[in-house]
Amino acid sequence: MQGLLRNVAPKRFYFEDALITTHNHDFVNDPAFRKAYNRGLKASRGKNSHNQWRVYLALWAARVCSKIEGDFIECGVNYGVTSSAVMEHLEWDKLGKQFWLVDSFSGIDERQTTDEERKSGALETNEVSKRDGYYNCDIERVRQNFSQWKSARVVQGWIPECLNQVTASKVAFMHIDLNSAVPEIQAFKHFLPKLSPGAFILLDDYAYVGFDVTFAEWNKVGRELGFEILALPTGQGLIHIR
């Protein structure tokens, strides 16, 4: 398939993170994007690479939300790839906003995994991810990474217990990437009353392969609360607050 596409459109071929397209993706060569993306890679020190379109979507949503009243929140920071890219892209300390960076830095919360997630191997994946360094468990490394910005606030703890440490009165943007349905939805519901009109919530795992439980649970909440989720070909999901 890759060979065929390269023959059909050799100058317009994108294949990364399970996304294949021959449509325009000139953003990958944009200097502003490259600078932001490379800052994200610096945070990961080689982990979590090859996800340019995911980061591109985060940068787009963050740019829109930078003009909206409220702070930014990331639930599920890991190494800080996406949030570092966003902060670099927006010249963060010039915005007058706080970026709240919430994570256990201990993998997923096993107490909150559903029966379906356990059956799909979530606990085993959690242990392997911690062992192999896909999940970052070194909070000091994270603090060092974000020391570049005065308006970055690292919050360590389990969701929802730690969320009272986030003192934002308004929220303009959320990036949720907890790899577990229950705490993702708890975080969303906690901050829902504080979301400003026009805010975006970017869900990292919503439509991603292997996250069927997350997809179903988010759709259920969407029906209950009356909002739509846009499924993106990257596996992400996007919610717009009106």
Kindly give the residue locations of the regions a language model identified.
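N-terminal auxiliary segments of SAM/dcSAM-dependent transferases
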Residues: 1-20
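S-adenosylmethionine/decaboxylated-SAM
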Residues: 23-52, 59, 67-242
